[in-house]
Design a protein with these regions (language model features):
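C-terminal catalytic core of tyrosine-transesterase DNA break-rejoin enzymes
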Residues: 58, 76, 123, 127, ...
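C-terminal secondary-structure termini that scaffold catalytic or DNA-interacting sites
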Residues: 145-156, 161-206, 215, 247, ...
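Short, polar N-cap/turn motifs at the start of nucleic acid-interacting alpha helices
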Residues: 142-151, 253, 272, 291-314
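Basic, Lys/Arg- and aromatic-enriched nucleic-acid-binding interface segment
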Residues: 43-46, 50-63, 76, 80-140, ...
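N-terminal core-binding DNA-recognition domain of tyrosine site-specific recombinases/integrases
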Residues: 1-77, 95, 250-256, 271-277, ...
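Active-site/catalytic core of tyrosine-dependent DNA strand-transfer enzymes
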Residues: 7, 182-196, 200-270
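N-terminal DNA-binding module of tyrosine recombinases/phage integrases
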Residues: 1-31, 222-238, 318, 330-349
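Catalytic-site neighborhood detector that most strongly recognizes the C-terminal catalytic loop/helix
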Residues: 92, 96, 100, 151, ...
Length: 393
């Protein structure tokens, strides 16, 4: 967060309005600033191959929000009387719908997966709606999967930290704020970045998530295998108490999971999605199961704002839309009393209702018995007549 914010200031805010006194910035100035941003080349092309030359609409929105935040602080400090960014016109960036897997595809992926760490990560992302950083930063002291808890459907995880790679300069600037643990550099070389366990970016991300029994048993098996590895490795194992770790106990970075995920997609010939889309699939699937209970789903995903679910995650799958069309047809266009729905075939008797009637009115049973006896006699005479006709021929 610190690195991205300073990058936005350095690449997009300072070059365009950095020299202006805050008191001189008006709503018109902000409108011109937004106009110029759309014609600013992306700073990413200096370091990476990018598909577009100019800054994207979503990036313009990020720049705008950061500048507005700075001017809000200036208002609080009485540097300026009001924030011109609050009255400026910014077109909302359109959220591109992310491709997701349906439940059948995820089941196929899990059945095909042979990588133990990836298998657990996929289960936690889909069943628990966790971000990859939250999964990789999960420690065993925050995993509650005892037999009584599983039996009572009360197995749960406590999400309070995430694994991330950050710049050392950012750590120094923030004085290690919200950092719980800094991992050493195992290569022995001094690097510009370092792996850390840190507080999630929002308070709502700190949460309790209940887990299905199957996932709890998967975690139990993982812990059993991990303890066996610790016993075999001895002093060669560095125990950081991480749920997802390498055989020597070192933390597993996101890029390792992404590499394994890419390999799995190729081997199983699965649709090309990013790992984070499993979290989107999770939210979508849960909204289907709980009939659109946004608050319950938000509790699992840890979103700060509920509209993130309605805007981004509430995918409507084609199969559901087809079912809706079928139900509409049945409910509106083909009511039960329509001519198209009439069935001219004899209706089968309701045996249960008939028995009840006979029990209530014994004389009805006698009448029915006489009718059946008469019908049987008629059928017998008919058969005899047909037999005589056949003999005469």
């Amino acid at each position: 967060m610190y690195d991205s914010s300073t990058g936005i200031i350095r690449n997009y805010i300072n070059p365009l309005i950095g020299d202006l006194p805050m008191q001189s910035v008006t709503v018109k100035t902000v409108d011109i600033f937004i106009h110029d941003l759309h014609r600013t080349r992306s700073a990413a092309e200096k370091y990476h191959a990018v598909k577009q030359d100019y800054i994207s609409d979503s990036q313009v929105e990020k720049v705008f929000k950061l500048a507005r935040c700075a001017f809000n602080q200036a208002v609080r400090w009485n540097v300026i009387p009001q924030n011109p960014f609050n009255q400026a016109n910014l077109c909302k960036a359109k959220c591109r719908e992310r491709e997701i897997w349906d439940a059948e595809t995820i089941r196929k992926a899990l059945d095909t997966c042979r990588d133990a760490n990836l298998y657990v990560c996929m289960n936690l992302s889909f069943a628990c709606s966790l971000r990859i950083g939250e999964i990789l930063g999960l420690t065993w002291n925050n995993v509650h999967i005892s037999e009584p808890e599983i039996k009572d459907d009360d197995a749960w995880l406590y999400i309070m930290q995430e694994l991330a790679r950050v710049k050392r300069s950012a750590l120094a600037a923030l004085n290690n704020k919200n950092i719980y643990h800094i991992f050493p550099a195992w290569t022995g070389k001094t690097t510009s970045t370092v792996l850390v366990l840190k507080k999630p970016k929002t308070d709502s991300s700190i949460r309790r998530v209940w887990i299905p029994k199957t996932v709890a048993y998967v975690l139990q098996e993982l812990r059993k295998n991990q303890l066996h590895q610790i016993e075999l490795a001895g002093c060669d194992y560095t125990d950081y108490n991480l749920v997802i770790a390498f055989p020597n106990g070192h933390p597993c970075e996101e890029k390792r999971i992404n590499q394994a995920f890419t390999k799995l997609k190729a081997e199983a010939k699965l649709p090309d999605v990013v790992f984070h889309s499993l979290r989107h699939s999770s939210a979508t699937y849960k909204l289907k199961l709980n009939h659109g209970d946004l608050k319950a789903t938000q509790g699992d995903t840890g979103h700060a704002e509920i509209d993130m679910l309605t805007k981004v995650y509430a995918h409507i799958l084609d199969s559901d839309r087809k079912i809706t069309a079928q139900r509409f047809e049945e409910a509106f266009y083909q009511p039960q009393n329509s001519p198209e729905q009439k069935d001219n075939s004899p209706s089968s008797p309701d045996i249960a209702a008939l028995i009840t009637q006979i029990q209530q009115y014994p004389e009805l049973g006698k009448i029915l018995s006489d009718v059946l006896a008469k019908q049987a006699s008629t059928d017998e005479n008919t058969e005899n007549g047909n037999g005589n006709l056949s003999d005469s021929e």
